[in-house]
Amino acid sequence: MSKIEILAPVGSEEMLRAAVFSGADAVYLGFSGFNARTGAGNFDADSLKEAVRFCHARGVAVHVALNTTVYGGELAGLADAVRAVAASGADAVICQDLAVAKLIGDIAPQLPRHGSTQMSVHTLQGALELKELGFARVVLARELSLPEVEHITEHCGIETECFVHGALCMCVSGQCYMSAFLGGRSGNRGSCAGPCRLPFEANALPEGKPGRLHHLSLKDNSVIDKLDKLQAIGVASAKIEGRLRTPEYVAAAVSACLAGREGRAYDRDLLKNAFSRSGFTSGYLDGKIDGTMFGVRSEADAELTKKTLPALRELYRRERSRVPVEMKIEIEEGGEKLTVTDGTNKAFAYGDAEPQPARTDPTESLSRSLSKTGGTPFSVEKIDVEMDGGPWFVPGSAINELRREALDALLKKRETLCPWPVNEVELPPLPLRTLPPHRTLRARFERWEQVPEQALSGVEYLILPIAQADRVPREWREKTLLELPRVMFGALEEDTARRIAATQDAGFAGYEVSNIAHLRLCRGLPMTGGFGLNVTNNLAAQYYADLGLSSVLILPEVKDSDISTIAPTRDGKPVPTGVITYGHMPLMVTRACPLQNIHDCAHCDKTGLLTDRKAKKFPVRCGLGVRTIYNPVPIYMGDKPGALTVDYGVAYFTLESREEAAAILDSIRQHAPFEGEFTRGLYFKGTN
């Protein structure tokens, strides 16, 4: 059984040293401009090479995060970033956007790709689809239980990676739009402002009263004491979250993970003092998802961290001897030769000290001197001593100099970069769409009861959750797309597969897919792309079109000028693109329930409100094992039909009654102003 890899976060050069010196097997760090932690100290082409040299010399792998969504105007810079990573010889790239995966496959096809947790992979079919697309590893969603992780790991055929320590986002990674819509800072772009750490109160509050409790803030995850179980089921890598944290935090987490992997006790209090939010939770992996998972960073927590810093720094003050080497020293009358090998590389050192005849066997003292590798990454496993005509005495100072010279030479050899082969790839120019002569309207409803009788009039497609399929009259089905659940925890993926099988010959127009797993579930069937795919550029849109999508809904975070550069084709014909024209945007989809802070499920009607510090009320709806938190203000673009160069708009109904939906559809058809509070979303502002 292979040892599970300890993978540490790096957000600065000091964090890199802390991770390596405390014993991490691998590190992950961000490449400037294209990673999900823009606030961290990220690496450019030159500093990345130095980081790879430092790590590879010590037997530590380097994974580079290029795991943001990318806009069209950034694709040329992204291609340069891929070339830089390939030139560094880093061990893998972590990516979210299929445009990144596509460019790696074209430019540096041998460079391994890891599917970021931002890809929202949480099911077996999602992991299998990544394998089909050429990924070597999948970083699984944090929300999974141990049996769910085991099921995926056992059957997916690629490596799996699990978070074992660090911050827990409230929302399923890759599906959070709260920071973008509330402040223009996109989590999918690495700029999350962390609004879930602000007050959001689930208690019923009077209108105008601000929320003061933190019912969207989860404690930090820590399942280090379950590393043996993760290792036993075949998980390849144990990931520590925290590129925005400190070297001391990294050292504490790595040290604890090393102990946990070996079944030794570790100082849980020291780990907690390094950083916690009122303690830790293991609720997801244990399958115990309840109100005890929530917590905040208190002043007492911060004070404990300050007091613990000196002890934590001791964990990474010294170089760790971690690279096993073998030595052979040959002594003859004219001088000495020392050979050092790590099994792959060899280094030599020659001495000219004139050996003197020894009165006793010097083998033991020679071995002692040669074994003194403190301050280097090397650990001597074996020493051979050969003497021609001896025994010979050589001064200890001469032996020490030989050792230093040979180990320095070996270190330099290990620091040699091994770039990945690259292909010359020229990116096609960005397309520039013009406004189509006729733009269509699609209407998405949460349940059949919302659908007005006149909905088919002037609507290209209805979109309904697949669980509502039996409610749709046969005469409506050829214009109805069945929406698959964005998130399918537990048995929901198998249930969804059964529903697809039961409906594929029932006269429906096709399926709206919003997760990478859906591509596999619907292979060979008519598919359209939903916003959960996070399409932000033409390269990704084209990739999805090549995988079978007949239309693509662009992520509502994309600005108008970037929307106009998304124009995929299929068989030489344009593939329609669309935007959400109306709707309360689902800002979060969560497995933990914020309403559990005030009552249990038995006393819940599956609806609720969260009130923020500005007294805004965010609707919450529970269903299919998750909770969806909606923007209190809807997007409305119905009176701006020519503002966005797309083929269709989607009226995305969630909270509305049938009468409200009918009135809104009429307003969109008539290009009328919206009555009430609304937002243009990010279509004109964009995100940073």
Question: For each of these PLM feature ranges, what is it?
Answer:
Residues 2-121, 140, 147-237, 244-543, ...:
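Active-site pocket-lining/capping segments in soluble small-molecule metabolic enzymes
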Residues 132-135, 157:
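Extended, well-folded interaction surfaces typified by the phenylalanyl-tRNA synthetase beta subunit core
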